[in-house]
Amino acid sequence: VLASPVVSDPLRQLDICATSDGAAALIVASKSFAEKHLGSLEGVPSVRAVSTVTPRYPQHLPELPDIATDSTAVVPGPDRVFKDQILDAAYAEAGIGPEDVSLAEVYDLSTALELQWYEDLGLCGEGEAAKLLRKGATSPGGRIPVNSSGGLASFGEAVPAQAIAQVCEVTWQL
């Protein structure tokens, strides 16, 4: 990794996941259909809830002379950025907080992005992600294993197949 070319300091080429081809599929069926066709539900994961959150953005459309103009200079951003909004809603809906999470599988397009998710998920304070990693807390067997699958570096970024692979990984881990 350290011998690979610098892409954007401090990230090097091998710190960033390569975009790749791939495919994934999930079969979603009712309990009765699965029992009828499989004979048993042993080893079959069940879904008890599904939720989505749509981030909120400013509702103002400024009249700007140049499309490349930074609209944040004219329109204030939302109080909470989209990841904060989504995480707040997910934790509230699940009735848990970051301290209750026992594993995580995050989108880690780069090594830096995985560290950012540690902070965004509330697994550590701002600026403490590297310390959490160095303590081994995010390793398999640690306090909060993160990306025990190996993350995107292990199977590539085949959008959206990698998201399904990560959902499968979390299901297997649970």
Model-predicted regions and their roles:
Residues 57-64, 108-131, 158-161:
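Short glycine/threonine-rich loop-to-helix capping motif typified by GTGT followed
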Residues 128-140:
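Short mixed-charge
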